[in-house]
Amino acid sequence: VITGAQKPIDLAITDARSNLLDSLRFASHDRAHGISIVFGGKVIAGTRAKKEFSKSYNAFSSINYPDIAVIHDDRIVFYIDDKEQSTKLLQFYHAMDDRIFLLKLIPSINPLVLENLADSYDGLILESFGVGGLPDYGNHDFAAMIEKWTSAGKLVTMSTQVTHEGSD
């Protein structure tokens, strides 16, 4: 369970204390599992959470997926109870590959940038500007550059810069 606050805990008006208590309350619940963010009275799947506000107490939203639960008056109200569907044993990773590059595609970006990154990175996250299509500029081909990465055993994944409705 991950939490935080928009205001420091030592201030008179803060969300830190309630977020901390809510996160402990949820983490100790027998139906809690997986990676979750507890913030602003909501429990959000860690894989779906996005910080959308820099000052508001409801800073995080669940993108294209319902909140797992809400915490109100010290009570947890579950909207999703999928603990029984979690069949894999818990596995902890103590080391992570930090040679992953996030590339936000923009109109007119040259696909050769992927060639320049290949020697320095083991993985690539491409953020497209729509439902997941790759730009096509004729003589420089994004698909061919991605093929070079995957042929070299590197991981490439695609996402979207658009917050709602996902990618294809």
Residue ranges of model-derived segments:
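Active-site histidine-anchored catalytic micro-motif
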Residues: V1-D168
